[in-house]
């Protein structure tokens, strides 16, 4: 077994001696999530119910997945019709294609309600 070198003769890579020290804290990268919105909707539906962080993570993944599917389908529809803009019509059609039966009807009515509320508030 070779002997361990002593700490005297070794040079360590690092900052130059004349460089000013920057002891500023690094900003943590923000992780975007639908968590607060999922929580608000859950409290509207079931005010006395809580949600674990693992369940919240699953719900967040679900919302991201559905969002990506709707966006991809709406994009495909716009491309088929030689349009360069995704409008509420493409999104509505994408929802009708992706979601089954009654769920699609409810999603379309809620979406229409949200768009109407947004346009009247402007």
From Swiss-Prot:
Pfam families linked to this entry: Histone
Covalent link Isoglutamyl lysine isopeptide (Gln-Lys) (interchain with K-5 in histone H4), residues: 10
SUPFAM superfamilies with a match to the protein in the record: Histone-fold (SSF47113)
Keyword tags: Chromosome, DNA-binding, Glycoprotein, Isopeptide bond, Methylation, Nucleosome core, Nucleus, Ubl conjugation
Paired cysteines (S-S): none
SMART domains (UniProt xref): H2B
The organism's place on the tree of life at top rank: Eukaryota
Family: Belongs to the histone H2B family.
Protein name (Swiss-Prot/TrEMBL): Histone H2B
